[in-house]
Swiss-Prot record:
Domain of life of the native organism: Bacteria
Region of interest: Wedge domain: 50-149
Database matches in NCBIfam families: PRK10917.1-3, PRK10917.2-2, recG
The name this protein goes by in its record: ATP-dependent DNA helicase RecG
Species per Swiss-Prot/TrEMBL record: Staphylococcus aureus (strain MSSA476)
Amino acid sequence: MAKVNLIESPYSLLQLKGIGPKKIEVLQQLNIHTVEDLVLYLPTRYEDNTVIDLNQAEDQSNVTIEGQVYTAPVVAFFGRNNSKLTVHLMVNNIAVKCIFFNQPYLKKKIELNQTITVKGKWNRVKQEITGNRVFFNSQGTQTQENADVQLEPVYRIKEGIKQKQIRDQIRQALNDVTIHEWLTDELREKYKLETLDFTLNTLHHPKSKEDLLRARRTYAFTELFLFELRMQWLNRLEKSSDEAIEIDYGLDQVKSFIDRLPFELTEAQKSSVNEIFRDLKAPIRMHRLLQGDVGSGKTVVAAICMYALKTAGYQSALMVPTEILAEQHAESLMALFGDSMNVALLTGSVKGKKRKILLEQLENGTIDCLIGTHALIQDDVIFHNVGLVITDEQHRFGVNQRQLLREKGAMTNVLFMTATPIPRTLAISVFGEMDVSSIKQLPKGRKPIITTWAKHEQYDKVLMQMTSELKKGRQAYVICPLIESSEHLEDVQNVVALYESLQQYYGVSRVGLLHGKLSADEKDEVMQKFSNHEIDVLVSTTVVEVGVNVPNATFMMIYDADRFGLSTLHQLRGRVGRSDQQSYCVLIASPKTETGIERMTIMTQTTDGFELSERDLEMRGPGDFFGVKQSGLPDFLVANLVEDYRMLEVARDEAAELIQSGVFFENTYQHLRHFVEENLLHRSFD
């Protein structure tokens, strides 16, 4: 959520009881700078201190019980500075022995006939509880927290502040702030939502699980509604300035180019080309996402579009996330276009006189198509008349980077490409009203990759399988999650150790190493050797995840595969299976969690990237699917795009109705409109 000005406070943080200069420093580390921030600093979870019936309590379970003290507490000391306090409670006519280790100070706080609440582990056989916390009723004189805290909020904190302190300070702030409603009475009544006052007070100090659910539902809807208001308003602004030059491409020339391709387009590719061409002919700027599974042929579709721009007298640009991918795209496009187009490559490695000449040719129109990394968005990169901007693996760039590239031309058409199929849930959130073309069909002759799962102890067997492929003249990838060994992850294989091991097995000259710490020149040299079949086995981190294309590679081993998400595993797997030869992917993993086992099982069951993306989103959540910063998604405090998908659709419909009807711009919504405009509209989530 944004910095809040719909919550007004009569004082600053320093004026709150218990907050001094040192506490301010700690709060600032938690991104709490104002009383408003404090009020919106929501708990990460809740401790359930609800008192239960002992007759229903399971043995060795954590329980909360309430009873009357009927023996005075006794403390016994043992060892060095260790103690054991024993006291007996009567709990609904059941005599319970309570034991507290290393809390001797409780002896002065617990009195005969006093009613107390104890939280701890229950031993049904011995009828005793090993307590870790004790609460006193609200009428008592003790300083500990009250027993009426059934659902206790737990906050993310840092050294220098305690849970009780932040709870007390939030309670104090809530008593004094003025909270303006973010939703209209009409919306709240329509969807049976609570007031923001009730919602915030309940999220911080819930009186019941039912209240907490109602508060969570209201706040989640509010977050989604404000986000969708921003998206709908931005869409309105973009469409109002979306005038574009109609690209009058040479249809006969384009058809001739397609006929000269060394392969036949799939029906899905043809459909995508037609959809894009219709956009190019339209008087408004194209804003389209081209998504396709790994190896589905998105680059060819992009190439046809670039060629069409050339026939109409316009330049095109393609921005990709890595230098390796940029070089590979440039190489493949040069081969496709031949002498018909002047293709240039601009990355961070292009410097000095070479860069100067390239920029001059770009500005005078000599270059038809520019391929590059984020170097394309630098201020001195000036196009002559760019008509199409393509961003490959667009979620790896921030919102601002994509916008800067788009602004290289006054009326530029925009095409986003991704080999990570976007789940529908994220598509409507991140991409709003963007048109989507999908390529779900693989080129003719491609065989599905056979994926198997092996445990670590089966490594030698997998090695024999890989050796068998190498003897056929094929090549192989071996993927590891780490570059170097880690003391925190001792059981995880690292790429350097595995590289050295495979060198001993196959010979030094046959094995190459690729990872993110190598320089661009070193990476290029290794990839060139692998592409030219000067090395048989490439040991790598996930730096090869996207776009690398070596058709002769037919075997992939992914070590410690359970440390990757489904989408990453699928992208890695897509480096093989790029020819008419049968390819194999072996996942080596001994997962210790149910989630890890589930991921391995799913990978062996399907090669459909669209299905995998949905499953990955369900398992990991939207924040981890792309990474919040890369995706353009805000970091919602309560809302969850998977669990609250239906709510997201409702919020989107309501926001769209308000914006499109113009009602949002009337006086009734002045307060909310100013809030969205000042806090959200021009805010980037990069």
